[in-house]
Amino acid sequence: MVSWETSIGSRWVPLLAGALLFTSCGGSAPPPPPPPPPSEPTDEESDAAQPPTTQDQEAAPVPFVFGVDLDTVQAGVFDQGKMWTFEFPPTDYIERTHGFRPDEAWFERARLGALRIPSCSASFVSPNGLVLTNHHCARDFVTQVSGEGESLLDDGFRATDLADERPVEDFEADQLVEIIDFTEEVNAAVDAVSAGERSEVRESLLEEIEAGVLEQRGGEDSGYEVEMISLYNGGRTSAYVFRRYTNVKLVMAPELQIGFFGGDPDNFTFPRYNLDFSLFRVYDDNGDPLSTENYFPFDSDGLQEGDPIFIVGNPGSTHRLQTVAELEFRRDVSDRYMLETFRRRMRVLQAFIRANPEAAEEHHLRNEYFSLSNSEEAYDGQIRGLQDPIIIARRQDTERDFQAAIEANPELRDRYGDLIERMAVVQEQKRAAAPVIGAFSVFGNPYLDSSTLIRGFFALQVIAMRQNQAPPGDIEDMMENVIETPQMHPDLDAALMADRFTEMSDYLGADHAAVAALLRGRTPLEVAERIVQGTMLSDSAIAVTALQNGSATPQDAAVQAVIAFLPAFLELNALYVEVGPLEEELAAELGRARFEIYGTDVPPDATFSLRIADGVVTGYEYNGTVAPIFTTFYGFYDRHYSHEGKEDWALPDRWLDPPSTLDLRTPMNFISTADIIGGNSGSPVLDRDLEVVGVVFDGNAESLPGDYIYLPEKNRSVTVDVRAILEALDEIYDLDRLVLELTTGELAATEAEADARR
């Protein structure tokens, strides 16, 4: 999946969270040298859990790989991708590559028909506010609207009439209506101060600009949102103005087994057989379906091999402009440790879900496990790419060319000549802190850490702030963190806490002062269970009350645990306080240098802002054979029966006995060379006439290194074909009103009305 998962590595303890994940099942969100840690528990699990040292991970230089002299490896033309911006539309490139020249109106239609929704992308697909996205982007909302006795995630949801569509909360659909360039103003302000002040000045100015632009459009209640978007690591800065829609209802979502057919085994693979789609509807302020001219009609005729396609969506994050030293640090330290944390937490979650199915359903833990599993697969694939000497050699070639271009210009050399070297020094500083980085990987994430431990962390700060007579507003802000920490089942709370304590012991060593003070000769699980049972902070409501009335003290068991490991935590925090601003400034200067040298010929890294990626419908070689371009319902049923209906390939009853009119020849999924990443999930796949031919939901395994390099030879995006969507709506779900709307644009309030019109 390729949605952009922000729940892991979010604002919680931001200096240490360090990750924005991809849930696609592909694209999706990003680590070990060979051999990688096992993804499932094995007899060697205890060995795999030991923290690898930097020395273990660094391989000696290899001049030849499979007969290839690495010194002769050259970068590809599109190694840095094809995620083109709407600020600098690739008009000439499209004309050269695809044989037509889109005008300004074409790009405007593409921009206004697209939407950004939570962690994903979407689009208007009818003049009546109908919105198409992925099923995996809708899971949380499907769970949200399930009534008592319903299990809509498993059973699916279909609104047969307009009145049956169900309102969803916290769904924001953002339509990009304007882009305003502020690069000169921002760069002038940054250049006017010393290097140590630039980060703070930049942040302050961006906040000021954002507030001013929003005020010009009517303020916070205007229905507009403004976001400052920095491209090229700050080399370009613009205000993106969005029309935000929040009155949204769920219209249709297939069963989980259909939207995620094949489960984890088929994730990030092709051939694929998924109906990973869902439909929402935007309503206006009067409660009527939104009337809009900005939508993409369905192209029910579909595509053929060699056809060009365009994916318009919001890729979440890439690091294709990072230096080789930064990538090597990720490979050897940060991303590797994060991957191991994901694998450990997956085992904890899986064990709890199996032992407590009802509690797991109540806390929506299956959705969390799906996201975590997806992220684990993404990070594993990206790390494997970073271990590929040829990929690193291509990145080194790109970096050499960049440095040479800087050196060739005296003015650029004076300003930017030492940036790459200085960035390498910063990475070495961080390497020195590898043990504490591992011990606190994604620390504070509410889905990967104990809620009690997180509350203890914030509670300690509340207590200290009160003792130091901090301003009431600051204390209230810290209390918000306690309030927003979600409630967790006590058994899962203790298991996650024990897993964190085990990591601290593994990475820091059992003799480390923090570990010794924390465990005192006991096992991590013994300590965790005593804390959960003995603290006032294991229940969110009680925790808030205790902090408000002062009954929660430094002697609380959870607070004492935080005090025990705090010195090690602060060691890492101090490092990031020291090098973080410098690293950010170096990245911004490198971005400016790249833009001055290459201009818009090299697309910027993804920023969860709107992009357009072109591609061609074509296959690729894999596993000694050739992948088909299209899969069909024939293959879908073959997959089910070949696996004897096992869990990941099981089918709901309505699919086990389909009507004889279901056309099994219908194309179901297809692949293209379009460049995507986490956040693109739900993006419309368009033909040259801006008609929808599919909705992208994943990438193949070969696309996983796409975080840092685009390899068009085998990188493929995976898309649900609209012909399969229409066939399923018509023949399986009997939703004639949606088929009518998607094929003609006509809105029917009921199935009976739609039947009469058809």
Locate predicted features.
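Terminal presequence/propeptide segments associated with secretion/organelle targeting
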Residues: 2-4, 10, 19-758
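Small-residue packing motifs within transmembrane alpha-helices
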Residues: 13-15
